[in-house]
């Protein structure tokens, strides 16, 4: 015998994402049940509460709600009871317990959790973008980057990019190789979003030598050769001089955090 579909109304003072996730998690414990969700969001006034319940009464079902305003939550409880509706308050009992536990009243500001979730998803998207645009990958995506870092190999492009990504910025980085022009897409974006990284030659020799040893290789050849590195850096400097709109940062004595702070202050501040 086919079960009838039950209606569940999700009422929220924000987007309703939180209440829906909780209800779906609870429903996963039940087999062979069918539910149709109806979201009613942005409930911020008494009129909104009354209108929401009128919507519920068109095709009655269970009401599950998250309203941080205690007066609106009480109004919804009273009206639901008056109409014989099952209504479950997901957040008020928790707010009361937390208030007692911490000895502090809640802010009662709608949408705070959604704001936190949005910031989290922004960081996730930024990290995903940055990974996909590391070391010159997919130059077509440079236009979507908040910052574009350029510099020679081992000049902190990747760690700096990832640090900024965890701050919520989409970052691409492009390697500068002596004698090879950067991709043309680099010059089609807002040039004030491009950051040129420069580093002292001796410090770069140390970094590249350590890198080779970590890979089990002898520090021979041009990769860690001082004169070769000086030539690479001079090629970089000439490129930066030809593009005066780029922000140039010397990372020799700066930590990743310090370099990131300078970029954010000068380009996003």
Swiss-Prot record:
Superkingdom, taxonomy of origin: Bacteria
MF terms in GO: ADP binding; ATP binding; phosphotransferase activity, phosphate group as acceptor; protein serine/threonine kinase activity
Binding site for ADP: 151-158
InterPro entries: Kinase-pyrophosphorylase, PPDK_reg
Coiled coil residues, start to end: none
The keyword Phosphoprotein appears for this protein: no
Protein name, entry field: Putative pyruvate, phosphate dikinase regulatory protein
Lineage, highest ranks first: Bacteria, Pseudomonadati, Thermodesulfobacteriota, Desulfuromonadia, Geobacterales
């Amino acid at each position: 015998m086919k079960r009838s579909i039950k209606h569940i109304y999700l009422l929220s003072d924000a987007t309703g994402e939180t209440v829906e996730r909780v209800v779906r998690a609870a429903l996963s414990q039940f087999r062979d049940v069918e539910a149709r969700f109806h979201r009613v969001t942005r409930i911020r006034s008494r009129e909104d509460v009354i209108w929401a319940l009128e919507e519920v009464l068109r095709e009655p079902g269970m009401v599950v709600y998250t309203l941080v305003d205690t007066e609106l939550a009480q109004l919804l409880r009273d009206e639901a009871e008056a109409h014989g509706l099952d209504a479950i308050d997901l957040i008020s009992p928790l707010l009361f317990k937390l208030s007692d536990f911490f000895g502090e009243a809640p802010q009662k500001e709608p949408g705070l959790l959604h704001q936190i979730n949005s910031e989290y998803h922004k960081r996730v998207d930024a990290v995903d973008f940055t990974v996909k645009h590391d070391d010159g990958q997919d130059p077509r995506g440079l236009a979507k980057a908040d910052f574009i870092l350029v510099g020679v190999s081992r000049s902190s492009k990747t760690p700096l990019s990832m640090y900024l990504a965890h701050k919520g910025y989409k970052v691409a980085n492009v390697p500068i190789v002596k004698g090879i022009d950067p991709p043309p897409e680099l010059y089609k974006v807002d040039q004030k979003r491009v950051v040129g990284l420069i580093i002292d030659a001796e410090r770069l020799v140390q970094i590249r030598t350590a890198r080779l040893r970590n890979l089990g290789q002898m520090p021979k050849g041009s990769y860690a050769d001082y004169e070769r590195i000086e030539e690479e850096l001079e090629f970089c400097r000439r490129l930066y001089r030809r593009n005066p709109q780029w922000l140039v940062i010397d990372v020799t004595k700066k930590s990743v955090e310090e370099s990131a702070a300078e970029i954010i202050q000068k380009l996003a501040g």
